[in-house]
Amino acid sequence: VSEAFGVRKAPFVIEWRDGFKISIAQIDAEHQHLFQLVKALNLQSADQTVNELLDYVVTHFSNEQALMEKSGYPSFEQHLKLHEEFGAQVAEFLGSGEDWTEERVQDVRRFLNKWLIGHIMTHDLRFGRWYKERQLTAPKPIAASKEQRGFLTRLFGLK
């Protein structure tokens, strides 16, 4: 917490809102969980929370991509590329080897929240609208194949 001139800076936290929903229940639940993990990030448990967050991002991206591919989403390849670019940004951002400080925790929160909101409110919302226009029933919960997880796991450098 920055204490310039004796003033404590409040933690950077963005709460999940219904306005972030894309109307696909599983994806919305996964997005909400991502927000909860970002909110839980703190100096005392930074490494543990970041590892849990990255693991869950891999699962979420895999599930979302599996649904896009299965449904024939025409912008699937572009969306996949956005996920890959995010992975590269995260690897660069977190791979610096810097020690955790309150400022770094806040920077990571800011980065993740900004990316999540921007991505959900543009690209995922576009997919949600496209999907709803073409589907008569809600999708069954999906889980990506191990092969897809393996690719994303390698992308994030996780074992």
Regions found by a protein language model. Give the residues of each.
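Small-residue-biased structural context
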Residues: 2-159
